[in-house]
Amino acid sequence: MNDIENIDALFESLAPVGSKRVAVVIGRFNPPTKGHYAVFGAVKKFIREHPELKLEAGPAVVIIGGGKSDDDKKKNPLSVAERMVFMKASGKANGVTFFTAPDAFAAFSMLRDKGYEPIVVAAGPERLPGYKQILDKYFKTNDGKSIVHHSLALSRDEDSVETKKKEKNAAVDSTLTGLKDDGAVKLDKVSASLARRAVELGYEPEFAKIVGLEHNPKLAKKMFDKIKAAL
């Protein structure tokens, strides 16, 4: 079966509509960065500004993992459990409810199983249309009527952009050089790829800034060492 047929088969076992309406953030967070925490903040702001949607106060954040891609430690050095622990310990994910799933459809389906209904999905422009399409096609009312779903477009996710490895590495290294020179990095340049590369090069202070833990050096070092051991 192809991917669409697989989803169609899974659709047959979807739970009824959940009673708790949520805004959903889906990602690998490998590792979690200050960019991810900025996303959580943006989603919380959206929830506050749209009371008419009757959303839960905090976003549902689904950590993607558990599939074959986890075997590639270069891209996925931290386990799902480790990613969740680091985000909770950061103090930057207050009000967030964490879940895990192997892919986007499983994430939305799992939320329904737990009594949540995905109403808003937040993602970068590369992934957002696909997520919205899944929700609109498969996640309907119990009598088959359409549910109005909303998209929250976020700044580009560097890890989701398909570029040649050599070009991507050059861009990442250029950003890291700038970070070492002036100690600052623009939020739109932050990515999990940047954090992993900082570990590869031994840039521990820069890594702490990328992951938003420059004021929690103990936790930053623990994450740095975990990633270094896995690479």
Walk through the language-model features, giving the residues of each.
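Nucleotidyltransferase catalytic core that binds NTPs
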Residues: 2-231
